[in-house]
Amino acid sequence: MSSKSSSHTAYLDQPKPGRLNIQYAPDETTQIVENPPRFTWLPVVENEARYVLRISTDKTFSDKATQTYSNIPLNFFTPDTTFKKGVYYWSYSIWNETDKASISQWSQIRKFTIVDNLPSTPLIGRTARYDKCATSHPRLWLSPELITQFKSELKSNPDHCSWAAFFEKSVKPWLERPVMDEPAPYPNNVRVAPIWRQTYIDCQELIYAIRHLAIAGHILEDDDMLAKAKAWLLSAAEWDPDGPTSRAYTDEWAFRVAVAIAWGYDWLHGQLTEDERTLVRKSLMARTKQVADHVIKHANIHLFPYDSHAVRSVSAVLIPACITMWDEEEQAREWLDYSIELMLTV
């Protein structure tokens, strides 16, 4: 990849990071524990800026000794290849994809050392990342092939993976339970602890009802259980994404509703008509977007990586929700890329 500079080289701001900011890394004080190392830096102010990263065994970055990664959309990066033992230097710049060139000064040069026998943990680039991913459903926990295997093992051992306890405690309670109504807002929209706690529990149980009935229905080939799970799912999909279970109203409720709908969309995909899939996916997209927008645009966890709710929602909500629909919704794939790169790099 070219790392040539534009004729109009802009100033590159490199502010000193605070204790709670993402750091410039690696440097010569960093103990590298995996190969390749993870590269992080403070983002520039410009929205949607892209970067070019150069890594070299030569401090002058001669072409022969330098690897260059361009058009990086985030201020953190994991290369798709490992490095040989040795001393390396790296720096970054702002990238213009139209001109295929660096358009700013290069950053301060930092140094790191790769030693022998480090765990090999490269990250496949975005272009090829999903090439070998199955597009069948379900995707969360078990694939169709693993479901077949699970059924076979359950026939030879009725308590395989503690199935009896799972069915008794996590499936049976939902067989007769009526479908949950949409939670009501707080009285006068003033948060009250007992209502917060009870609705939190109710939304957690929404996950249990949809997920556990759907799993048991598939494993036991029980149409009644699948129909019950579907009824819960379609009801939740009709709830107002901007209502009491929106992220802005009460994030802990919103997280659980989004996760419940994600499991339902995935495990009941074959039980839904095309119109029902559209309904459920529209709801899931709206709820996932609320979380993604908060994480990426408002909490800015790629700059402030210690916001507990925002960071937790990446693995708890964004990843499972986006896994279920990455091949159907372009934005979901973008959010999944962000989540994968954040979790693996930062």
Task: Outline where the language-model segments fall.
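Low-complexity, Ser/Thr/Pro/Gly-enriched N-terminal "stalk/linker" regions
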Residues: 117-191
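Conserved aromatic anchor
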Residues: 36-46
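Extracellular fibronectin type III
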Residues: 3-8, 97-117
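Recognizes extended acidic, P/S/T-rich segments that occur
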Residues: 50-87, 97
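Residue-level recognition of well-ordered beta-strand positions that form the cores
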Residues: 40-42, 54, 93
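Aromatic-lined, polymer-binding surfaces characteristic
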Residues: 183, 196-346
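Short, compositionally biased P/S/T/A/G/V-rich stretches that sit at domain boundaries
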Residues: 1-38
